[in-house]
Swiss-Prot record:
CDD domains: Transaldolase_FSA. GO terms for biological process: carbohydrate metabolic process; pentose-phosphate shunt. The gene is tal. It is an enzyme of class 2 (transferase). It catalyses: D-sedoheptulose 7-phosphate + D-glyceraldehyde 3-phosphate = D-erythrose 4-phosphate + beta-D-fructose 6-phosphate. InterPro entries: Aldolase_TIM, TAL/FSA, Transaldolase_3B, Transaldolase_3B/F6P_aldolase, Transaldolase_AS, TSA/FSA_arc/bac. This is Probable transaldolase. It is found in: Cytoplasm. It comes from Moorella thermoacetica (strain ATCC 39073 / JCM 9320). Keywords: Cytoplasm, Pentose shunt, Schiff base, Transferase. SUPFAM superfamilies: Aldolase (SSF51569). One of its GO terms (molecular function) is aldehyde-lyase activity.
């Protein structure tokens, strides 16, 4: 499994990238708006930091507009992946963008049926939203469990990005189920890094060393 970071905050991206563990970035209009900065500038900054796929989402809702917006976004940097919502017009846009050699990430996926249609349209990635399904008392991870064998059965090259990650267990289970990627908020990434026994063990090692280092 690969780990992407789900944020538009450049400082968070720098910090995560310095750890040497992230392979890409996902953003969305809400994350961009939270930064209160020019969209293109943020995407260009991210592309200068991370050498991997960077998902940037369209805000149009008709296929021709999504395609035009996607072409414009893709021109910013070769690593840009166009995020397209899982709607009928979105599938049309995915088909056209894919035909032009532009990578796509179909977002707001909440069922295996939606993921199947996105793969058939030629999506590079699909992003099932685990946490949002959990929020309405559905099993978000079950959707990943449903998608993985379908894609394997028919040899789809579309990669599965576990999205809407709320806690480290989501990442662990998505990895266990066979998702290709988990896109993780910075806060959850830091939670994955830490364990109280690691801190306790390190403190003990250092304390023991202090007792003998000058002997």
């Amino acid at each position: 499994m690969r780990i992407f970071i789900d944020t538009a905050n450049v400082e968070e991206i720098k910090a995560a990238n310095d750890l040497g563990i992230i392979a890409g970035v996902t953003t969305n209009p809400s994350l961009i708006a939270r930064e209160g900065r020019n969209f293109r500038e943020i995407v260009e900054e991210i592309a200068a930091i991370v050498d991997g796929p960077i998902s940037a989402e369209v805000v149009s809702t008709t296929a021709p507009e999504m395609v035009a917006e996607g072409v414009e976004l893709a021109a910013i940097h070769p690593n840009i992946v166009i995020k397209i919502p899982m709607i009928a017009e979105g599938l049309k846009a995915v088909k056209e963008l894919s035909a032009r050699g532009i990578k796509t990430n179909v977002t707001l996926v909440f069922s295996a049926n939606q993921a199947l249609l996105a793969a058939l349209a030629g999506a590079t990635y699909v992003s099932p939203f685990v946490g949002r399904l959990d929020d309405i008392s559905h099993d978000g991870l079950q959707v990943i469990a449903d998608i993985v064998p379908i894609f394997a059965q028919y040899g789809f090259k579309t990669q599965i990005i576990a999205a809407s990650i709320r806690h480290p267990l989501h990442v662990l289970e998505a990895a266990r189920l066979g998702a290709d990627i988990a896109t993780v908020p910075f806060k959850v990434l830091m939670q994955m890094l830490k364990h109280p026994l690691t801190d306790t063990g390190l403190a003990r090692f250092l304390a023991d060393w202090e007792k003998v280092k000058n002997k």
